[in-house]
A protein has these predicted regions:
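Condensing-enzyme catalytic core of the thiolase-fold
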Residues: 1-188
């Protein structure tokens, strides 16, 4: 089992799958009568190049900059986002790096433990080149259905992850997604 962010994580668990999404401008999707599961308001990509910890571990600062840039482009603050679908590979090195980057990008949030943190890898394993689209599909369905799916196999946080003093909590059961604003906003 993949145990994202958990103290008993044992590493990468492969899965097999593929995913496909159709991206359209909102006005075109509305005009064409398409089913709209979610709207992407902003995104960012980067390359951490020489900042990487190692070949297998990205840079905390570079990840945090990409997350913050996506928030800015979407016109959102960390407080607006109540669910994050993380990469969450369930490795002792990768999960703390990702959590540190998220914590840095959400540093302006005044609330503690208001934002659910999940990883589809706990449900279906790491789909390699399809891992990102699997997380996007999971999140789009969560937005559309109003339910945050459970992150499975989590017992207690990795010793390098301080959930208590962060904006995040690990969502271990399916739960209704009813943010105070009434608008479901997520990061992937």
């Amino acid at each position: 089992h993949c145990r994202a962010f958990s103290d008993n994580s044992s590493g990468f668990v492969p899965g097999t799958g593929a995913g496909l999404v159709v991206l359209k401008r909102v006005d075109e999707a509305l005009r064409d009568g398409d089913n709209i599961y979610a709207v992407i308001k902003g995104f960012a990509v980067n390359n951490d190049g020489s900042e990487k910890i190692s070949y297998t571990a990205p840079s905390v600062d570079a990840q945090a900059r990409a997350i913050a840039q996506a928030q800015r482009l979407a016109g959102l603050t960390p407080q607006d986002i109540t669910y994050v679908e993380a990469h969450g590979t369930g490795t002792r090195l990768g999960d703390p790096v990702e959590f540190s980057a998220l914590s840095q990008a959400f540093a302006g949030a005044s609330q503690k433990q208001y934002c659910a943190l999940g990883s589809v890898k706990t449900n279906i394993g790491h789909l390699d080149t399809a891992a990102g689209v699997a997380g996007l599909i999971k999140t789009a369905l969560a937005v559309q259905q109003g339910i945050i799916p459970a992150t499975l196999h989590f017992e207690r946080p990795n010793a390098q992850i301080d959930l208590t003093n962060s904006p995040f909590y690990i969502n271990t059961t399916c739960q209704p997604w009813q943010p105070e604003s009434g608008i479901r906003r997520a990061g992937v």
